[in-house]
């Protein structure tokens, strides 16, 4: 987020000057490559949306061409790495106060060079008011779009594409935001938009919705009556007054009417019997704060009851609230949530959206881009370029609040392939990828934020070392450090800024920030070297395994999987060893492992299962490059193939830490096939299939996987899922329930986490699960 000089002391003119002189890459990023625009102008805020292309570096691997050569390949790297420029699509959303609209349009005009469009889609009440100004400044024709259609299109888009977009507000919780996991079936729902008035819309599908009701008593009523009662003209100042008021001084409560007899009615004595009821009889002056609070309760309760009645009428249990009246204000969300809970007896859920302020702009953009069919793609929030859900609490006072004089930002990257649920999830709506919610667990939150802060020096050092020929690598690495450090400080103050805070979101944010400053794969050369070493060891490891008896071999294969998983550059306990001892290898890793019984030990049950019929098809999610994939995973895969089980080996689509990528796995498999007839024939006969997950994360979200992978899982009838590594099997998916057998295994390489789980460093998780009949 770029501050616009808003300390509360300067004039709006000073703020404006400072905001517009900020570098364009801080606010209107990639503006020079903007292709299409949309704008949503409300009563006080403007939301600009634009689609641009982003050029960034990606690391690609390619097998060496050995044709016609008779050379000694033992000490040659297994593949070559090249860094290429890639162009991807990104959606940018910028939110700012209407005060700045003319200066912002001038700024856009000055930096606009590559736009392909002659039209800008516009929605919101201000679209008509500012039409001439926009056309004059940008020389683009304004096409006005229907407000409600845009809101609904925007709402559908964020619910589908942004995990943890929706949240419930719980007044007495810490923090007060409870984020919902992505529901695979978002329809039907009720959208209640509270602007000047209230509109209530039933949304049934992507394109089918109907206006079912509304009210003239909305945000405009609160503003208008509030101004008359308190002489306060500014909406946010009214909310600030309300946050400090005590409504019971003005409202008549049930206990004021019935005394102690209210209990026979089954009502709480604190319920409002009559809004402003005391003002007619009490001979006293009421404070502005109390009147504002009473007014807020009156209007929120009215809206809540109306929404609840419509939800029940249409048999809906999810109601999303948005509009100028909400805007993430705790005092407003609190009263609406209370009202919905009371009138529905807890059967209807009041939900709010992290990005509700952008819905109109997103919808207007989607309307203008229909010929490009943006809904055929999946999109992901780019944490590096988004300012997150900032505190808007009126309790802070208007002068201190981050909203005043700021530009809020949201960026969405278009993903290469559509993402869908893993078909083997037992109950997709209840699936939660993350094991620990750090917004809930203050002790864990403090530990992990400190852990990521302390690791920053090492990440910066690794990033610089990965680009020895770059003259500006150190400068870019410092920019990365500052950006990620700032994100961590934001999350210390506001753990809910980007939805549910988890170890996964901290890792993903770091990867986004590294990509932002053109460090696409800091571990590429480390992986190349370790893959080369491990490939040379592969024949010996397989020969050794083949000499063992069946039962002894099964344990050796599992220990090999676990030992391979030790080689994780993302774990400080391991990276310290690998950097200080270049001879630390596969056998040394085996000796590090906890002796049986392991911390979680289902090995006996797994061995018993192996004595039964072979699985039809195993889906394996691999973790690290090098020893892990080559000496741990591939021998395990080979054994499954020998049993008659088909194998789908799923690896990351893009790089993260030293995790193996799909591109690397193809080359590794090709090299192993050249040494091993079992793997060779399985690849040729398509009994071994290598696929990409659609992810570039060290963790695993089974609700956002490559559509092609999901189709293959269905087609091959996968009946075993193997998830390997701390990020995929412990930080995520430890509690994931599947409708087939599963194996989750990892070595705990973090002493704090191991102790929390009741173990020690290098404790072993081996969790074999069979679904209930």
UniProtKB/Swiss-Prot annotation:
Sequence segments annotated as region (Pantothenate kinase): 2-402
Single Gene Ontology MF annotation:
ATP binding
The UniProt record gives the binding positions of acetyl-CoA as 196, 199
Q: Where in the cell is it found?
A: Cytoplasm
Q: What does the activity regulation annotation say? A: Activity is strongly promoted by Co(2+), Ni(2+), Mg(2+) and Mn(2+). Activity is inhibited by EDTA.
Write down which residues bear the modification named Phosphothreonine. Answer: 406
Q: Where is this region: 4'-phosphopantetheine phosphatase?
A: 403-773
Which residue positions does Phosphoserine occur at? Answer: 393, 404
Cofactors named for this entry: Mn(2+); Ni(2+)
Its EC number is 3.1.3.-
Q: Where is this motif: Subfamily II EGMGR motif?
A: 724-728
Query: At the top level of its lineage, which domain of life is listed?
Result: Eukaryota
One biological process term in Gene Ontology = coenzyme A biosynthetic process
Post-translational modification N-acetylalanine, affected residues: 2
Name the catalysed reactions.
(R)-4'-phosphopantetheine + H2O = (R)-pantetheine + phosphate; (R)-4'-phosphopantetheine sulfonate + H2O = (R)-pantetheine sulfonate + phosphate; (R)-4'-phospho-S-sulfopantetheine + H2O = (R)-S-sulfopantetheine + phosphate
Q: Cite the Pfam families for this sequence.
A: ARMT1-like_dom (PF01937), Fumble (PF03630)
**Hey, which family's this protein in?**
In the N-terminal section; belongs to the type II pantothenate kinase family. In the C-terminal section; belongs to the damage-control phosphatase family. Phosphopantetheine phosphatase II subfamily.
Query: What's the domain remark here?
Result: Subfamily II proteins have an EGMGR motif about 50 residues from the C-terminus. This motif lies near the metal-binding residues in the putative substrate-binding cleft 2. Subfamily II proteins occur only in eukaryotes, in two forms: as a stand-alone unit in plants, and as a C-terminal domain of pantothenate kinases in plants, animals, and chytrid fungi.
User: Which protein, by its recorded name, is this?
Assistant: 4'-phosphopantetheine phosphatase
- Gene for this chain: PANK4
């Amino acid at each position: 987020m770029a501050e616009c000089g808003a300390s509360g002391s300067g004039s709006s003119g000073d703020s404006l000057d400072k905001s517009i002189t900020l570098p364009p890459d801080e606010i209107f990023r990639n503006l020079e490559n903007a292709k299409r625009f949309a704008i949503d102008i409300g009563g006080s805020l403007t939301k600009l949306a634009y689609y641009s292309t982003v050029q960034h570096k990606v690391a690609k691997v390619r097998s060496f061409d050995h044709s016609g050569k008779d050379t000694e390949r033992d000490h040659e790297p297994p593949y070559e790495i090249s860094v290429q420029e890639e162009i991807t699509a990104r959606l940018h959303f910028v939110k700012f106060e209407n005060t700045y609209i003319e200066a912002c349009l001038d700024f856009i005009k000055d930096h606009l060079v590559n736009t392909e469009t002659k039209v800008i889609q516009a929605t919101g009440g201000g679209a008509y008011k500012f039409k001439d100004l926009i056309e004059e400044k940008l020389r683009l024709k304004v096409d006005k779009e229907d407000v409600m259609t845009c809101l609904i299109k925007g709402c559908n888009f964020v619910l589908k594409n942004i995990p943890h977009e929706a949240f419930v507000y719980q007044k007495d919780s810490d923090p007060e935001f409870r984020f919902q996991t992505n529901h695979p079936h978002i329809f039907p729902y009720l959208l209640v938009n509270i602007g000047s008035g209230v509109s209530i819309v039933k949304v049934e599908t992507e394109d089918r919705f109907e206006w079912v009701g509304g009210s003239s008593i909305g945000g405009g009523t609160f503003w208008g009556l509030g101004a008359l009662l308190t002489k306060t003209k500014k909406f946010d100042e009214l909310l600030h007054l309300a946050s400090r008021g005590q409504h019971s001084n003005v409202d008549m409560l049930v206990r004021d009417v019935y005394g102690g007899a209210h209990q026979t009615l089954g009502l709480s004595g604190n319920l409002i019997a009559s809004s402003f009821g005391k003002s007619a009889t009490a001979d006293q002056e009421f404070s502005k704060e109390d009147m504002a609070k009473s007014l807020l309760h009156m209007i929120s309760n009215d809206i809540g009851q109306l929404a609840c009645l419509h939800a029940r009428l249409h048999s809906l249990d999810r109601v999303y609230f948005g509009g100028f009246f909400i805007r993430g204000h705790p005092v407003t969300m609190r009263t609406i949530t209370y009202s919905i809970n009371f009138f529905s007896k807890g059967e209807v859920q009041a939900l709010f959206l992290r990005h509700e302020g952008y819905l109109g702009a997103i919808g207007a953009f989607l309307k203008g881009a229909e010929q490009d069919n943006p809904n055929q793609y999946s999109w992901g929030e780019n944490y590096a370029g988004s300012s997150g859900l900032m505190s808007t609490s009126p309790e802070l006072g208007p002068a201190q609040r981050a909203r005043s004089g700021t530009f809020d930002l949201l960026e969405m990257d278009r993903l290469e392939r559509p993402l869908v649920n893993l078909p083997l999830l037992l109950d997709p709506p209840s699936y939660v990828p993350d094991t620990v919610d750090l917004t809930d667990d203050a002790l864990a939150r403090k530990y992990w934020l400190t852990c990521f802060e302390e690791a920053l020096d090492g990440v910066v050092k690794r990033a610089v070392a990965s680009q020895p020929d770059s003259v500006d690598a150190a400068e870019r690495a410092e920019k990365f450090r500052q950006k990620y450090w700032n994100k961590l400080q934001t999350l210390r103050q506001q753990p809910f800024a980007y939805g549910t805070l988890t170890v996964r979101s901290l890792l993903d944010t770091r990867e986004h920030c590294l990509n932002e400053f053109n460090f696409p794969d800091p571990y590429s050369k480390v992986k190349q070297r370790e893959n080369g070493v491990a490939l040379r060891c592969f024949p010996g490891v397989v020969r050794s395994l083949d000499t063992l008896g069946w039962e002894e071999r099964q344990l050796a294969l599992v220990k090999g999987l676990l030992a391979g998983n030790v080689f994780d550059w993302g774990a400080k306990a391991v990276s310290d060893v690998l950097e200080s001892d270049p001879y630390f290898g596969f056998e040394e890793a085996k000796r590090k492992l906890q002796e049986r019984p392991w911390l979680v030990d289902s090995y006996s049950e797994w061995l018993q299962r192996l004595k039964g019929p072979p699985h039809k098809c195993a889906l394996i999610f691999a973790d690290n490059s090098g020893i892990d994939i080559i000496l741990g995973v591939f021998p395990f895969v080979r054994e499954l193939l020998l049993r008659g089980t088909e194998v789908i080996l799923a690896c990351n689509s893009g790089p993260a830490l030293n995790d193996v990528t799909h591109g690397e796995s193809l080359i590794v498999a090709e090299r192993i096939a050249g040494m091993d007839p079992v793997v060779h024939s399985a690849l040729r006969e398509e009994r071994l299939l290598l696929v990409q997950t659609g992810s570039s994360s060290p963790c695993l979200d089974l609700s956002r996987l490559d559509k092609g992978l999901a189709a293959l899982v269905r087609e091959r009838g996968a009946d075993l899922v193997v998830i390997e590594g701390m990020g995929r099997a412990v930080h995520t998916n430890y509690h994931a329930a599947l409708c087939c057998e599963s194996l989750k295994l990892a070595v705990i390489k973090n002493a704090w986490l191991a102790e929390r789980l009741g173990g020690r460093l290098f404790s072993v998780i081996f969790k074999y699960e069979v679904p209930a009949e």
